Amino acid sequence: MASNWDLFGTTRWFRNIAQYDRSSAASAWGPAFHQRNETWTENQSYQLGSRYHDERYLSELRGAFSKQDAYDYPDTSGRDQSADRFYTRQYTLNWVNSVKLDESWTLGGGADWQRDMLDDSSRSSGVAFPSEAYERDNTGLYALAQFGNQVWQAELSGRSDDNEQFGRHNTWQTGAGWRFVEDYRLSARYGTGFRAPSFNDLYYPGSGNPDLKPEESKSHELMLDGQTAGVEWRLTGYRNDFEQMIQWAPDSQGMWTPQNVGKARIEGVELEGEFETGWLSHRVSAEYKDPKDKATDKQLQLISRKGAKWVSQAQWQQFDGSLSWIYQGERYGDAANTTQLGGYSVWNLAVGYQVAPSWKVSGKISNLLDKEYQTSVGYPADERAYYVTVDYAL
């Protein structure tokens, strides 16, 4: 194709099989029982897109399709006998545009469309889902204006979503920056957000919650960034307020499902840095935050106060690789803050080889040291996992 045109595509596939303890103590809902369940999930996704770009204009059109088949069943039976089966399909279209008016001004805008579908052969405990669960469309329109010179930067954007299930929601963001000294800048941002529950949140067998409401948010950020002694760094203070925040929590029967936790606030500070040591490039970050349920004044469950990350990357001829370390501090496994989960750190390794200009083969090992830890009470994290990816671009 012409040098101003790009055509690209990706395809991905994965299958996951896991076991968990579905036992329950005696309660008002029934006697105690002991049962180990197995989940089987297969996901496929495909994306195709085209991009045009020149010195002033960029336009990109992307289309994607994904499908997921999921089963939940006692490990004494098989997948074919599963009373919980969940077949979802998702179609998306996205059109993005930007035009550079002059050295200072850039305008952008676009549209996107998403259709979520639940196959009518899906079942939860052997029961079909309500007809309103089978299909949902969301159409979004957005626009952006940016200004920037050597001293000042500013941005204003707006978005309108028309969700077939939850109605229309309008959100916007604005920000400004001041480069008060060469290599140092002070910035501030404010924005509103809207997130509809996914089909998995609403209807996934054994854990979906069809009563979920959309999540709405307001975010405030104050940033100072600069470059000192060869290190590019950024210090950010933020406050995020949520209405009907969606979070995993136990229901009245002790089963973990997505829940609206009401009003929540997360305040924090994050320090990020980028630097090089010889042929290695590094990205590091450290964060401290206070995630709070405003109704109870308790720490939000499953969200830690402390976190850190380090990623080191290298490239040599057709080879590239990265080694990363992720740390999450202690957090609570319940809304009452009575059960504490320990902190953990995980290493990941990735390598890639550019076979040809259009072909690349990559491999990744997650949880390299096979660390044992829990993501929530009674749910151990994945063991060491291996991934292979083949990318092709025209």
How would you label these PLM feature ranges?
Residues 103-107, 148-154, 239-241, 259-336, ...:
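Gram-negative outer-membrane beta-barrel transporters
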Residues 38-45, 65-155, 162, 336-338:
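Outer-membrane beta-barrel transmembrane domain signature of Gram-negative proteins
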Residues 4-55, 59, 63-90:
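Flexible loop and strand-edge segments within Gram-negative outer membrane beta-barrel domains
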Residues 27-28, 32-49, 134-136, 165, ...:
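Outer-membrane beta-barrel signature, preferentially recognizing the C-terminal barrel domain
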Residues 13-17, 54-56, 65-69, 113-119, ...:
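Transmembrane beta-strands of outer-membrane beta-barrel pores
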Residues 223-225, 274, 382-394:
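Outer-membrane beta-barrel "beta-signal"
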Residues 9-11, 61-63, 107-111, 156, ...:
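Membrane-embedded beta-strand positions of outer-membrane beta-barrel proteins
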Residues 3-7, 44, 55-61, 103-107, ...:
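Outer-envelope beta-barrel architecture signal
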